[in-house]
Every structure is written in C-alpha cells, then in structure tokens.
Amino acid sequence: MGAPSVGDVVVIPFPYSDLSQSKRRPALVLAEAGRGDFLLCQITSKQYGDLHALPLKESDFLSGGIKRDSFIRGTKLFTANEALILGVAGHLTHSKLSEVVSQLIDILSACLKDDTF
C-alpha cells in the first residue's frame, strides 16, 4: 500500500486512552508529520456525548466509505506510523474535510481565550 493522503479514512489499530489495548478502527488522516508518520483523528460509530463529534455519513465520501454512519472525534488525535495503517476505506469530500479542520481550529483556539495560558 502507498502512503495515505490527507482526507483518507484509514483502518488502524487505535489505542484506548489508557493504552491498555487497541481496537481496529477507522481514522481520518489530517496531516503528514514526516518520516512516515501521520496525524490521525478517531472515527467511531458512537458519539459518546462528545460535543465536538462531527457526524460522518455515506454522502461525506468522495470515494469508498465505512459500514455505518459514524462520528469524527476531533478531540481524539494521535500520530501513527504508516506501517500501522492496515488499509484505506475511503476519501472524504473537500467540504467535509474543511468542516473537520475548521472545528479543530476552534478547539485549539479555545485555549487562547483562557486567561491562564
């Protein structure tokens, strides 16, 4: 498999937040981080009460797709090496990718509004 592209939805062993285990999950490629590493964002079928979770539907894919409507969780990011990527499930439309990036900017900008920073 070749290197993934920004906007690809890949399948990867995604770690639980306590790093005790991992589960095969789709993840969105947000950026190339150099040396074969990529910044990824978790995609899950459950919203988990996450106020930042963006809905992901079949119509949000330019090509390919995933089995069910899901959520992109902008607060669940991690860096993974290309060797961990098990495959590419699809590629998002430009408009959906733009929505995700805009939301990430909002999430990260919120810390600048905090007087303790």
List the model feature ranges, each with a label.
Residues S20-K23, V29-L62:
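Compact nucleic-acid interaction/catalytic patches
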Residues P26-A27, T75:
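Small/flexible residues
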Residues S63-F117:
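C-terminal terminal-subdomain/extension
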